[in-house]
Every structure is written in structure tokens, then in C-alpha cells.
Amino acid sequence: MASIDRKHLAEITAAVLSFLVSLTTILGIPVALYGYLVTQQQSRVDRAFQFYKDFRDGNLDADVKLLVEKANAKAKEMQALVDKDDQVGILGLQTSLVRDAQVDTALAHVIVFFDAVGPCVAHALCDADATIALLQYQAKQLVKGYGAYVYDQQQSGAPFGNGIFIVNGLEASSRISSLFPWPGRTAN
């Protein structure tokens, strides 16, 4: 009779342990997945912040200031052309700005930088929301002042200048979609 009680107790213990293992597995998988997603999100934010640090630590900040200063000097002329929807005139004015060697060099530096940032965001390797907060203002200023020129310099199939337009066009996402970036984001 004692061997039957031991056998019954062993079966009950095995069933309880099996239940606990199953429960732990069922609860552990979502927790592990959430941890993985949070880590990936933090990695994307860190990459975006590293671009921002590179922007601030290098001469890129000074380059953007120079470019904006030169474009702002022609802001009234630019606005008159925009009001008339004179695309050829806008391109001509922006091209005349880039004829200055300092402006040309600064624009080249900035375009190369944004050509690294844009695809990083477009392919969800960098966080879009962090990029918006840290770098979109500068991209918008540059597209406003030099967008027609950069667009005119692009060649079919070549990625030159795409990054600045990618960063310029970013829209803030909801918090849940930033944890799951793959369904909604596409490369331009």
C-alpha cells in the first residue's frame, strides 16, 4: 500500500512540475520577446544618437549654419520664386548659392552625412523618432534652402542626396509602432 501512495505522490509531483514548467515557458516567452524588442529599440536610438554626436562633434554643425546663413541671405528672392511657383528660378538661385566654394564644400559634407542617416532610418537600423528629434530640423532647413539643387544633382539609381529627403520626410510614430518598425516603414 505504501508503494502505491509513493507512486501516486510521484505522479502528482510530476504533473505539478510539468504544469509549472509549461506555465513558466508560456509566461517567459512574451517576457523574453519584450526584452528583446526593448533592446533592439534602444540599439536603434543609440545609433541615431551616435549620428547626432557625430553631427555636433564634427564640423557639420558649422557647415549647416553656413548653408542656412547663405540661404537666408536670399530668402526674399527665394520666397518670391516660390510664390510664383518658378521651379527653374528656384533651381537657378540655389545653384548660384552653391557656386561659392565654401557653400559647395559644406553642402557636400552635409549631404554625405545625411546619406548615411537616411538609409539607417529607412531600414529601421536607427530610430525614426530620435532622428526626428535630433536631426530633422537641420534637414528641413537644408531642403528648404538647397532641395531643388540637390534633387537636380541626383542621377537615376544613384543614392546621392536621398538621405536628406528621407530625414526631411519622417513622421513621428506612435510608441507601439516604434517597437515594431518593420510593417510600416519602407526605404524611399
Residue positions per predicted region:
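Short, charged, low-complexity loops and linkers
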Residues: 88-98
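Membrane-proximal alpha-helical anchors
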Residues: 2-90
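An amphipathic alpha-helical interaction surface
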Residues: 96-188
